Amino acid sequence: MAIAYAKLYELIHKKIKDEREADELYNAIIEIIKESKVIVKNELKDELKDELATKKDIDLVREEMKAMEERILRYVDNRFNQLLIVQLIILFAIIITNPNAIELIKLLFGFK
């Protein structure tokens, strides 16, 4: 950046022969550049705030993910319990309708 300022100063001195006027013009240009830098920096910062996720946004997403995970786990547990009940119903239906199964159960548990 310092090289660009030096080149700017040389160009001004080539075009304007009066040293004092050249210095005034150089200082005015430098001041405009500094003001422009601040404006551009603030605009960029505002744009990035809108575009990029902040820590607050990330925390909100994490909370939503945790809530979704809990809902999914509850759903899976509910389905698991339903499957268990259906399997038990089928097992009891097989046992009740099959006379040989009843005899086998009596033998397994020691009943005669």
UniProtKB/Swiss-Prot annotation:
Subcellular location(s) per record: Membrane
Annotated transmembrane regions: 85-105
GO cellular component terms given for this protein: membrane
UniProt keywords, alphabetically: Membrane, Transmembrane, Transmembrane helix
Protein topology in the membrane: Single-pass membrane protein
Family indicated by similarity: Belongs to the M.jannaschii MJ0023/MJ0349/MJ1072/MJ1074/MJ1107/MJECL16 family.
Name of this protein: Uncharacterized protein MJ1074
Organism: Methanocaldococcus jannaschii (strain ATCC 43067 / DSM 2661 / JAL-1 / JCM 10045 / NBRC 100440)
